[in-house]
Structures are given as C-alpha cells and as structure tokens.
Amino acid sequence: MTQSFTGRKRVRKVFGHIPQIAEMPNLIEVQKYSYDQFLQVDEPTGGREEQGLQAVFKSVFPISDFSESSTLEFVNYEFETPKYDVEECQQRGMTFAAPLKVTLRLIVFEVDEDTGAKSVKDIKEQDVYMGDMPLMTENGTFVINGTERVIVSQMHRSPGVFFDHDKGKTHSSGKLLFAARVIPYRGSWLDFEFDAKDIVFVRIDRRRKLPVTTLLYALGLDSEEILSTFYNSVTFTKVKQGWRVPFNADRYRGAKPERDLIDAKTGKVVVEAGRKVTPRLAKKLAEEGLKELLVQDEDIHTRYLAQEIVNMETGEIFAEAGDEITPELLEALVEAGHTDIITLDIDHVNTGAFIRNTLAVDKCTNREQALIDIYRVMRPGEPPTADTAEALFKSLFFDAERYDLSAVGRVKMNMRLDLDVSDTVRVLRKEDILAVIKTLVGLRDGKGEIDDIDNLGNRRVRSVGELMENQYRVGLLRMERAIKERMSSVDIDTVMPHDLINAKPAAAAVREFFGSSQLSQFMDQTNPLSEITHKRRLSALGPGGLTRERAGFEVRDVHPTHYGRICPIETPEGPNIGLINSLATFARVNKYGFIESPYRRVKGGKLADDIVYLSAMEESRYRIAQANVAIGKKGEIEGELVNCRIDGDFEMVPPDQVDFVDVSPKQIVSVAAALIPFLENDDANRALMGSNMQRQAVPLIRSEAPLVGTGMEEVVARDSGAAIGARRTGVVDQVDATRIVIRATEEVDSSKSGVDIYNLRKFQRSNQNTCINQRPLVRVGDQVKKGDIIADGPSTELGDLALGRNVLVAFMPWNGYNFEDSILISERIVRDDVFTSIHIEEFEVMARDTKLGPEEITRDIPNVGEEALKNLDEAGIVYIGAEVNPGDILCGKITPKGESPMTPEEKLLRAIFGEKASDVRDTSLRLPPGVQGTVVEVRVFNRHGIDKDERAMAIEREEIERLAKDRDDEFGILDRNVYGRLSEILLGKQIASGPKGMEADAKVTQANLDDLSHGQWWQIALKNEKAQSEIEALKKQYDESKERLEARFADKVDKLQRGDELPPGVMKMVKVFVAVKRKLQTGDKMAGRHGNKGVISRIVPMEDMPYLDDGQPVDIVLNPLGVPSRMNVGQILETHLGWACAGLGKKIEVALDAYHRENKPKELKDLVKQIYGDDPTVASLDEEQLVEMAGNLTNGVPIATPVFDGAREPEIVEMLELAGLDRSGQVTLHDGRTGEPFDRKVTVGYIYMLKLHHLVDDKIHARSIGPYSLVTQQPLGGKAQFGGQRFGEMEVWALEAYGAAYTLQEMLTVKSDDVAGRTKVYEAIVRGDDTFEAGIPESFNVLVKEMRSLGLNVELLTPAAN
C-alpha cells in the first residue's frame, strides 16, 4: 500500500486483525452519482440514455394540438456554462445553475379533408431556453440563493404488490382479514381485501369498496370464466349404487371424511369415517391403485355447479354456474337425464368458496353494468354512459400516461407473483390482476406468507436525481396544458417553437423544489462530519412519505435487513427516532433504488477475491458468515461449524455451505458510528448519543487528531472535501496562506493547462456560523501524488478528521463540582486556548428606495458623536480589523422620514437657517447585544447604473489584483513549460533560417538561445520537418492557452465591474462579517465520543487541580459515577489506551533528543519498530522521514482501533507496559490545594473531548425593556426577539402560595401588559416617587373582545349605574 504525503508524516498504529479487502466507496457518491444520472450533462455519441431529464422530456413530448394538425417534438437538450461559479454565487446570494437549452421541432401537417390523410407541410427547429437548472458542487451540495443546501434521500415503500393482514384488529372475533395492495410509482392504487364474511372486495384509490367480481367482469370475464380461473372442477358420474368420482390423493390429504371412503371398483371400504387421511396414507392408497371412489347423493349436496345446465329440449336454464346443488335440484337433474355433473372443486379445507360467494353477492352480471358501477364509485354524481365508463376504466390502470408501475414496480411484481414480463411493460395487465387475486385467496386458504413491509427489499431510496425528475415532470405537465391551448389559438404556420413555450412553470417547479421542499435542507455545516452525515441521510418523511404522528413502532425499529445497509445506531433522539437514518459505511444504492451491501464470495469453503453487492431480496437466499471468521493461510474457512445469517436467522453450518463472508466489521455502522473507538464496549443508547454529538463539535483554532482513533478519520477528511486533495500529480511551485500553485507533471495535455491553482478558503462563514479556514501542508518543491492532502481544512489535522482535542482526564469526584455529569476543567485549557473556537457572524444592511426618497449609506448620521463613528471610513462602512462591541455602528444609514406639518414660525426659521437634519432618521446597522469581535470582511453590492463609493472601488481593485496574480502565475508556469519544451526541440538541430545573427545550416546551441528573447525563439526555422511541425503545434497550443487564460480573466473582471443583481427596490447592500472568539467557559457543553456529555461547572486554577507524581496537573476531572449506569465502558478503555499512547510519545521524545545529541538513529529506529511492529509504511521510511515522523509523535503515538475489531484488553496492557506505565492504568494523584496524595489510585489518561455547538454565549440573555406583542401587549419571548421571561401559571401558584400579593400584581400588570400602568410607573420612577397604581391588563380586554365576537356582551357595571 503506497502511503500518501501526509500519511508518512504521522503513521497510525493499527490494531485491526481483519485485513480490509474492499475499498470503501466514496462517501458522497450517493448524491453525486444520482444527480449526474439525472442531468447526463455530456451527451455521449450514441445519444443519452432513457433516464433522468431525457426520460422526462421523452415522456411529455411530443405534444399535439387538439385537432392533431401540428406536433411539437423534443430533439435534445444541452447545458450552457453557468454564468457565475460557486464562490461568486455564494458571495452574491445567487443560485449556482446552468441555463438549459432545449431543441424543439414543430411539425405542421396538411390534412386532406376528404380522406383524412396527413402530409407534412412544414418543419421548424429551434433552441428554446427552458430556465436554469441548479448544478451540484464538487462536494454534493447545491448553492441556492447563496446558501449551501443538501437534498436528503427519501426512503419510501417500493412500487409493486404487497400482501398483508390486519393482525385480527378489525373484527371482534380476532379473525385475520387478508388484503393485497398494488402500488404504482404514479397512478391509482388498487386494493383487494376480505371482509369478516370472507367476501373479496376491491377498492380503487381507497374509495368505496366493490365486490372483486365487478372488477373481473370489467376485465371482460363472464361468471363461468371467473369460476374456471379460480377453481378446478370435479365430475360426478351416475352409476347404479350411487355416483363415481375420481380419487385425488392431494385433495384428501389431511381431511377427515364424514362417511366411509369406498373403492368404486371393488366396493371395499378403504378409509373409515372420521379417520384422518394422513399424507402417507393418501400416497399409499394412490400407489395401491385406488382410481375412483363411490359416493352417495348426500356427498353431492352443498357442492356448486361449475357450468350452467340447460334443458336441451326447451332451452330453459336449469341452473346457473356457481349454484348450490340442493337435493331437489339433484333429483330434477337426474330425472332430466343428466348423468355427468361437473362441480367446483371446493372442499372448504384446502380451497374456500370465497370467489364463488362473492359472485353470488355481486349485483352485476355483465361487463356494462360492472363498468358503470366502477364509474359511479370513481365519479359520484356524474351520469355514466357506456363510452365514458369504458374510457375511465381504461385510463385507470392500462394507460401509460396515467399509470406507471416503473421498472422497479414491474420487477417486484414479477418476483412476488412468479411472472416473467419485461420491465418495459409498466401498466397493469389482466393477468397481473388475476395473479394478485389468486395469491390473496391462496393466503386465505393458508398457502404462502404475507409480506414484511419494513424489509429493505420492500423499501427503496429516492435520491436527488429521482426526486428532481418527478418535480420537473410536474412542471412540464403544467407547461403542456398551456402549449396545447396556445397551439390551437395561434396561426400555426407563422409561429416558431419559441412562441409556443412559456418555461415559467418548469422553472417554478425547480425553484419550489430546491427552495421549499421538505427534503431540501439547509446544510449542517458545523464540521466536516456533519456535512458528510447530512448527505448520507435517509429520511422516511417528506412528500409521499410517512408523517411523524402516523409512523408506528415497526417502521422505526431496527430490521434484520438493515445489516450492512442502514446504521442501527445513528438516528435522532426524539420524535424522529427511526424515521431518519444514515447509510452504512460500505452501502450503495443500486439502479432500482434498493440499498446493497458488499460481501466476499466463498467457493467450496475457500474465500474468493471477488466482491459482490447484494440487495436485501437477493441476500435472503444465501448463508453469510461474519467478517471475523477464522481464515487459514490459503484463504480457507477454519473450524467444524461456522455461524451464519440466512434470511434474518442464525444457523451453524459447515464451511463448505457458506456462500459469502462480510467484507468488514464496520460495514454494519454509519460513518459517524465508525469514528467511535471501542464502540463494541458501549451501550447502544450512548453510542447513539456519541455519534450524534460528534456532528455538533465546533471546529477549534488548533485542531488535533485523536490519539485513539478508528482509522476512519482520514477517509472522512478526504471525502468531505474539507481537506484539499491534489487534482493531479505534480510539484509544488508556490505556497502562501491563501493559495497553492502546483505544476502538473502527469496528465498534461493541450486542452488543460499545466497548472493547478488551489485558492484556500480563509476565515469564511459556514451555515452554522462556524469558521471555515484552510491551511497549506506542503512546501515549495514538494512532490505530491494525485489525491494527496495538500491543505487542511476546518477540523482536520494532517489529513485526519480532528473534531476535538486530546486532554488529560482523571475520573474522581472533586468537591461536588462534577455532580450530575458536570465537568471540572483546569485554567490551563482556557489560558492555552485549547478549546477556543472562532465563530463568524454575518450582518447585512440594505439601502432601499422608499416613497419619501432613497435611503443613504453614509458617515453623516444625525445626533451621533464622533466617538461612535471612529471605526467608520468616509463611506460610512466599518474598517476591516476594527474591534467592535455591542451597540457599535457597523454601517451608517439614514432614512428620510415623513414631514410633519410645520407652524409658520418653524417655516420661517427653516427658510432662514436651512435646517435639514430633522427630516432623516438614523437606521444604522448596529452590533446586536452579546456579540463582540473583529471585523474580518466587508462586501459592498451596488445596483446597475449606480456609482460605486470609494470603499466598493477599493474592494474591487483588491479582487482584480488577486485575479491578475493568478493569471500571471499561470502564464509564468506555462511559459516555463512551453519554453523548456521548445529549447529541448531546438537544441542541436540544424537551422533553416532564423533571426539576425543566426547562420543557416549551423546547429542551435544554448548560447544562441540565451542571446535571443523568448519571443524570437519562434522565428527559428529548422531543416528537420518533424521537429518543425512539433514547434508549430507547440506554438498553436501556447497561443490557445494564453488566449483562454486572458478570456477567463477578462470575463471575471467584467463580472466584478458590472453592477450586482439586487432584490427589487434595493439600491445598495453592505455585508459585514465579524469574527467572534469564543473561549471555553462555565456553562459550555462538552462531550466525549461515547455519549458522555456534560456542562462545565467550574474552571479551577491550575495549581488547585489534582496533579501526577511528576507535578503535571490534570486538565479535566470527570465523575466516575457517570460510567457504570450508562454502560459506556468504551471511554475507560480509551482513557487507558490514550495514557499508553502519550507514554510512548514521551519515550519517543527522549529517544529523539538522544538522536539530536549523538546522531545515532539505532535507538530511535528500534523504539519505533517496537511500537509499530512490521508496519510496511514505517519500514519504508528513510532516516530523514523517520526523524520528521518521530517529531510528530512526541505528543503521543496515534493508534487506530477499528469498530468491532479493535484492541483487546491484553493489547492495551501490553501498550501500557511498553510505555513503562502501571498495567492497571491507574496512578497516585495529589490534591492540588494540600499536596497530599489521595487515598487510593485514580484512573488517569487521555480522552478525546469535543466542544459542542451549545455555547452559553449564544443562550444567555437579559432584557430590561423591549418589544411587546401587538395584540396582547405582553413582552415577546426568546432571545432572538429580545424577549422577556414568561411568568406562567405555575409561577403564579408559587407567588400565591407565599401570599406575595403585590409582587403578583406587578407581575401580571405593570411588568407585563398593563399599557397605562407601564407609563405611570416610568413617570413615577422619573419623579423619584415609589407609588403607582395598576390598571387593567390588556389581555383582559382581549378576552372581552373575544367573548363579544362570540356574541356574549361583557360589561363592567359600576355601583353608580345600579
């Protein structure tokens, strides 16, 4: 395995015992693949596949007008380049999208009025703009109106047919009522159900139920065909002694005959009455040659006729098919000479008379009546005619426009009903409906099993592409109606396709989906893990899905088929538990939308190398062993018996019967759960909290990768896009804090430039106001390979995910300060900024054009002193770098206010002094309470045609300089590459002609070239034709590249200098970004990775913290009582292992010092070999690399303990002993205040702690006087509204209990909603008086008004009125 650039700098010691064979799929593949399949941006030569956008257009077009004299056809579509790139869209608050151009063809026909024959009269083709289609960014997100959003994948019930029963809940007898439901992808649902009397009914779209035979009549069957479809027949033949009937062994199996069974041939009794016919006995009788039985009239009574019986002479009908044979009917038939009677084979044991009984209750007898009945149910109140009824029934299930099973639905139907129909047949067929009814009746007869709807074989995933496809289809169908009307109303000969199309509905559908769909969510961008988890989320909610209230326990529960597909651990706590899930690490979604999990194939008890992805349906047939089965040297499975899963159960089977083996132990869990070391030692509830809380970890100023990791850290950092990977192999040419320039050495061709420029994101704001900042890891001259990490992002360190910090923890009580999960921390942590994070707040102000005149952004603000303006520039906008506090002005703005009518005196004064300041008011943007920090960025946006102020010009100049620098660097590297290549071609070749001073026939030397300028090199012509043509090709490529770079630069500058697109009425907009530094403080929430969370209760001076024997104080003190009841023992194992890692780090530091003193590498090499064993990466390092790596290990040796395959206890003990520490993992601590050792040893070690996004600064809030609600006049609630604290019902009881009458009165009146009282109190306080009277609370008036609106008059009667 080749190690990456960062991987060599710090190698993780891996404790996993199971080798990883399969490569983990890219973690955001779900999103990217799905949307790529939808857009199919680059059209291949053979044309696009019938899927995604192509399929939508194909399904809606061609559109014909009502008279079919013209048709609008779809030819193809293409995307133009987006107007702005991702970064520009984020800054300008725009959507990152590409214009969609569709080529349409309008064909006009000439219709011959006599014959009705059509001939083509005119064909017009044209490209039509159909709105913008949002594009996905590199990282699987969408930029919509400037913010990053994620479209969450939806889990829904797969189309197809499902069989179920009501679990005995419907009827009081507890009888199981079976039902079947055919669910299409779009179209009407078809339900079949039994009622308590065993009659089969059908419902269409959950409307009123009809007997199922009505539907069968409508399908074109008559009553005899219906019976023959569902039942076999038995013929009774009249003989002297009674009736002869064929003996069928299957029919009598398990039956108890009421009368003796007599062999018709011999007349002997073969089975006595009441004796059970066992399967063995039935088989024996058949083998002994029993062919026919002799039965009496009583055996024929209560049977049903299979065919109608007609009196041949008179033509009258004796009996209908399905009629019951009564003694009278039998007698009449025998008298009329009918010797053979064909009956239905219904024995009420193996076959019930359900369909026959349904036929009997059905009032319909033919197709017309049935169609009209169905019409009446579907369209109640409309008068039916035969034609409309026929058309409606056709359109319900047999019309591809209105009914679509989808390929998935057809595949599922085929599997469930054992059909063999191509998946292009997407409507129902008569045979499908009959097969469904047969299967349902079979279930009632006790044959077969019902379906489990929570099985992942019956649930599928709809990802971005598919959701978008459905949405776009809705938009196009709305458009189709308008097009049809327009085609009929205009002169079709003169119009072009463009005139017929209004693309607004399609564009609106897209906008609505991305802007307001329940599945389009504001991306959780707290840290890289939360981004990745959000993109891999599966939600059962959303349009067409479940609702929280209706979802029962079964849907939310973990199902055996979740294994390797959906994580059983990661799901939210609260009302959404189990409805929102996460994809497992190795899982992928197949083309039908089912989740697949990978397995290694086993052939004859030996592991093969190929890896197979299986869906839940396929997997149920195989025996699958776990990843930890013992495997021999040659890949054979060891042991007599192996524990296997098969169809949700466990079996012990010999190795040669095993079909597959799991790929990896971590394929069960999701990414977040796979980041928890010793997950196997944590209780599931706590693991759930642990995986959820990692997503809330705030990126810190100094990230630090965990000492005890799981090996997943690198994968998450790479796939999330937080850390930057090299796009091509090359050499680092330039590096500074804001960008990296790499000269590519591979994959260089004429179409691409040979330079990769990576602009790093510096102190940008994320969706959650955390800080996104990238730092380069490479130096000039470093060789990097494709995919190597060249820059760290937020929460990553050396290419590893780093959500928190490793801190020294002691498990012990400390003066009650860690009661109830509180956390005690040392002042060192605050002093050294261990858990300090930067948060970036965005503030914006708009200058609008109002009725009274335009607002103005200016420094000239009325009634504001110079002190308040000290941070503003001449344009009235705050400087970058200014330290701002609550209430400070960030951007000055004045708004014109309405003129109040003036007295003549005022008018005179105004005329004399020209006083103008009074007619504007100060509406400046001020920093809200609770925020203080440094201004890090200012952006100014101007409307087209409005002059830019000085500040906007300065920002623009800076930006253009940056662009020019990028362009010049690319030019520089291009020149070096091209002229290097040119000199290689020229040197040593014969000259044909050249600039002055070069002789013909001479050879080109380096001296010749040095004398000429680069531009003159091109003038040299060579005699060698091949070399000359190479030079010409090179020159062409060089000129094209330069042109391309210049054009790109000009385009970007043009965009900058053009005005911005602002909302209507806005003249100018200013955004100010303030960076707030948040140190760790009392009240902040912290957590480990094992669900061990707590709030900081106190920050203790370093000298008072408990300290080790060598005087080192611990950083954090946790309560040991938080472990036993919570059963998350993983944190203790992590503590011990972290302690060992740090101990080894100290040993390496000592060896490194010795190396630097004496320059002897042997001791260092031996120690590293002792720690890492035979790790190939470590073995491949040279001395310089080894020393660099050792320098990175002095704070501790990082280790990986993969989930379910981690370090065992003996290995932890071995590590402790290797580090020279006590094997118990406990040490003697001393009390920091007295210096005394504590009574007994304490568990001490390193734990990876995270600071969570619940910061006390964001929550603490105080109000003096603030805004009131309009109607009730009570103070608003919540920090965002600067609200007050609600004094609720229970608080009132408390004051009542104490008899605090005056306090209570104040609370309910003057401190709340007594408007007059509030003013009086204020006046009293101003006067220095402390008496006041409370009036009537406004809420009482509201109550009175509400009662009056109900027609109840409420008045206050005074004694005087009486």
Curated annotation (Swiss-Prot):
Its EC number is 2.7.7.6. It comes from the Bacteria. GO terms for molecular function: DNA binding; DNA-directed RNA polymerase activity; ribonucleoside binding. InterPro entries: DNA-dir_RNA_pol_bsu_ext_1_sf, DNA-dir_RNA_pol_bsu_external_1, DNA-dir_RNA_pol_su2, DNA-dir_RNAP_su2_dom, DNA-dir_RNAP_su2_hyb_sf, RNA_pol_bsu_bac, RNA_pol_bsu_CS, RNA_pol_bsu_protrusion. Keywords: DNA-directed RNA polymerase, Nucleotidyltransferase, Transcription, Transferase. It holds the Pfam family RNA_pol_Rpb2_3. The keyword Nucleotidyltransferase applies. It catalyses: RNA(n) + a ribonucleoside 5'-triphosphate = RNA(n+1) + diphosphate. CDD domains: RNA_pol_B_RPB2. The keyword DNA repair does not apply. One of its GO terms (biological process) is DNA-templated transcription. One of its GO terms (cellular component) is DNA-directed RNA polymerase complex. It is an enzyme of class 2 (transferase). The RNAP catalytic core consists of 2 alpha, 1 beta, 1 beta' and 1 omega subunit. When a sigma factor is associated with the core the holoenzyme is formed, which can initiate transcription. HAMAP family: RNApol_bact_RpoB (MF_01321). Belongs to the RNA polymerase beta chain family. DNA-dependent RNA polymerase catalyzes the transcription of DNA into RNA using the four ribonucleoside triphosphates as substrates. This is DNA-directed RNA polymerase subunit beta.
